[in-house]
């Protein structure tokens, strides 16, 4: 692709007249510049009908070429950012999966909690940035279990009070792990407080009502719902209806 000025489009065989005929719009002149990334055309900048019935000239073309270069850089940077974000999310999923494999009773738990959390976020009409933050928080909500012994995670019987206290520490441990990563600090409330309860009987800080961050409330509901509707060694899964009523 190369930059192009067409000041008599009606005489150019490449010009499609159908649009003008249907819209009753008169195309007098056109300037087109390819948007390239590493010699690959990824788009086109186009303008038609310069103001005051003037014709496009070489100065206009030079300006458009410069603008196309800036657009190409912006689009390529956006692509690279999306790829980096996706790679990070996949890494987080792999970490969560590795932790999950230590506990034979929670297969697929992280994936379901993430799905439920995003469904709640959609219902609440959260912003895209809030959904991205929530998605990562849901994936990493149990990352602190990396510091819990296998014999406790895999225990089929009800936990002793001491073992339960050990399990409860996974929320704070998860927050401590993530606070060293500056880009993840916004998700820490969802990880640290996803076992808090509206009545203040949760852990680790006994938050109550509006003290709980929204991100933590959403992950808490998703996490609890999944725990209630899946089989555990000490009880059978509840029906979706019963779980919803209890929640």
Task: Set out the residue ranges of the language-model regions.
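Short strand->helix junction
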Residues: 52-54, 81, 102-106
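Metal-dependent catalytic cores of enzymes that make or break cyclic nucleotides
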Residues: 7, 24, 58, 89-247
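Short alpha-helical interdomain "coupling" segment at the junction between an upstream regulatory sensor module
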Residues: 59, 75-89
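Signal-transducing coupling segments at domain and membrane junctions
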Residues: 4-29, 49-54, 197-208
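Allosteric cytosolic regulatory segments
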Residues: 65-72
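A short, aliphatic-rich beta-strand micro-motif
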Residues: 28-37
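Short beta-strand-to-loop transition segments that serve as allosteric relay/switch motifs
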Residues: 38, 44-55, 156
